Amino acid sequence: MTHTVKTIPDMLIETYGNQTEVARRLSCHRNTVRRYLYDKEARYHAIVNGVLMIHQGGRGIYDRNQH
């Protein structure tokens, strides 16, 4: 089985910049597409076999002294 890995900027090239079409293909909101619009190196997201995978950073133990 072959796996395809893409990014949202790659899909925008395929859809000629249509963010709504990318959101429809990924079954997500258009604002989610806008959030990862400039993540060309796939540091925070990846599309594997047509499924959007997102890095959920910043979660964990709340440190009271940081705020």
Swiss-Prot record:
Highest taxon in the source lineage: Viruses
Transmembrane portions of the chain: none
Database matches in InterPro entries: Homeodomain-like_sf, Phage_NinH
Signal peptide (residue range): none
Pfam families (alphabetical): Phage_NinH
Cross-referenced SUPFAM superfamilies: Homeodomain-like
Entry's family note: Belongs to the ninH family.
Name recorded for this polypeptide: Protein ninH
Native organism: Salmonella phage P22
Record gene name: ninH
